[in-house]
């Protein structure tokens, strides 16, 4: 078995993926499978923080299109990510894994507040850190949150888990001629307008010299495979 490429990473999970085969809510078998994957990665000696999206509950942009202000819609979406983080924390703990949910919002009755010190301490204690609440500010995506938190906690890479095995020149589900890239620079990802992450996330990763690895999480063990350098995906770096 190959040695892990990185020792501390941030994994970005979409809220939509947590819904599993459903269009809304949390699919427990899917959450349990992700928890198993994260536990297996931790056993490789890798420190893991996970940023979860909220699209299975609320998407701020969609809510704002229905008359709610964008700032309010985004706040609703960020609160949805807290619910998802609690679901993942519970699944990990139920399987015997040390895990803690940290929120960008102050909600002491629900979970701990994210601070750099709290995250560093939890990782040093061997806990899987699940990050909810986005950045705590509207207008920023959870992709940008993942890069921001990675920079804050000194992670070596961001793993963007998606439903496709990398970055393509076009949507491979719609265009059979779409080309998959093995590697892109941050600037190429921004200039290409690839929709796998937003430009702000790529720009922050470029500024902080953080590689982003885009891969499919569809198969069990995909996160570990990518971290051992054995998986199929796109590396965005440089």
Swiss-Prot record:
Disulfide bond entries: none
GO CC entries: cytosol
Pathway noted in the entry: Pyrimidine metabolism; CTP biosynthesis via de novo pathway; UDP from UMP (UMPK route): step 1/1
Catalytic activity line of the entry: UMP + ATP = UDP + ADP
Location(s) in or outside the cell: Cytoplasm
Function: Catalyzes the reversible phosphorylation of UMP to UDP.
Name of the molecule in the record: Uridylate kinase
Gene name linked to the record: pyrH
